[in-house]
From Swiss-Prot:
<comment type="function">
    <text>Required for rescue of stalled ribosomes mediated by trans-translation. Binds to transfer-messenger RNA (tmRNA), required for stable association of tmRNA with ribosomes. tmRNA and SmpB together mimic tRNA shape, replacing the anticodon stem-loop with SmpB. tmRNA is encoded by the ssrA gene; the 2 termini fold to resemble tRNA(Ala) and it encodes a 'tag peptide', a short internal open reading frame. During trans-translation Ala-aminoacylated tmRNA acts like a tRNA, entering the A-site of stalled ribosomes, displacing the stalled mRNA.</text>
</comment>
<dbReference type="GO" id="GO:0003723">
    <property type="term" value="F:RNA binding"/>
</dbReference>
<dbReference type="InterPro" id="IPR000037">
    <property type="entry name" value="SsrA-bd_prot"/>
</dbReference>
<keyword id="KW-0963">Cytoplasm</keyword>
<dbReference type="InterPro" id="IPR023620">
    <property type="entry name" value="SmpB"/>
</dbReference>
<dbReference type="Pfam" id="PF01668">
    <property type="entry name" value="SmpB"/>
</dbReference>
<dbReference type="GO" id="GO:0070929">
    <property type="term" value="P:trans-translation"/>
</dbReference>
<keyword id="KW-0694">RNA-binding</keyword>
<dbReference type="GO" id="GO:0005829">
    <property type="term" value="C:cytosol"/>
</dbReference>
<dbReference type="InterPro" id="IPR020081">
    <property type="entry name" value="SsrA-bd_prot_CS"/>
</dbReference>
<comment type="similarity">
    <text>Belongs to the SmpB family.</text>
</comment>
<protein>
    <recommendedName>
        <fullName>SsrA-binding protein</fullName>
    </recommendedName>
</protein>
């Protein structure tokens, strides 16, 4: 079950490989995420010291959060992957033009997982081409739907 999607990711990047990772979270973060108080829009994934981290994910603390801790809404969160996957990702990210983009948060066996992808940034003309292609598909579906209704009525 998906918690939140980063819809802007597919608009801004060509998605090549998808990965799923666990995250190191604190208790108050898990409660807030389960309550839907999370945003992925400005977040990104980086490689630092041979490990992979998620930066910029905003988790708004619940008003009932404990008073003895100071929740940091945008703290850096470590992603949990196998060493082989990390090595493979580091090799790909070091190539020119590749980046790691968070796609969505979801539950898997009661745990919160992050789907992220290896992607290349789209240029403005690529975004226009994608939009044009979507419009064409939508128009084609509309015409076919309308055409089949007319044919059924005539029969």
């Amino acid at each position: 079950m998906s918690i939140i999607d980063n819809r802007k990711a597919t608009h801004d990047y060509f998605i090549e490989d998808r990965y799923e990772a666990g995250m190191v979270l604190e208790g108050w973060e898990v409660k807030a995420i389960r309550d839907g108080r999370v945003h992925l829009k400005e977040s990104y994934v980086i490689v630092r010291d041979g490990e992979i981290y998620l930066l910029g994910m905003h988790v708004s603390p619940l008003p009932t959060a404990s008073t003895h801790i100071r929740p940091d809404a945008t703290r850096t969160r470590k992603l949990l992957l196998k060493a082989e996957e990390i090595r493979k990702l580091i090799g790909k990210v070091e190539q020119r033009g590749y980046t790691l983009v968070p796609l969505n948060l979801h539950y898997k066996n009661g745990r919160i997982k992050l789907d992220f992808a290896l992607g290349r940034g789209k240029k403005l003309y690529d975004k226009r081409d994608t939009a044009r292609e979507k419009d064409w598909q939508r128009e084609k579906e509309r015409v076919l739907k309308h055409d089949t209704r007319v044919n059924q009525r005539d029969s």
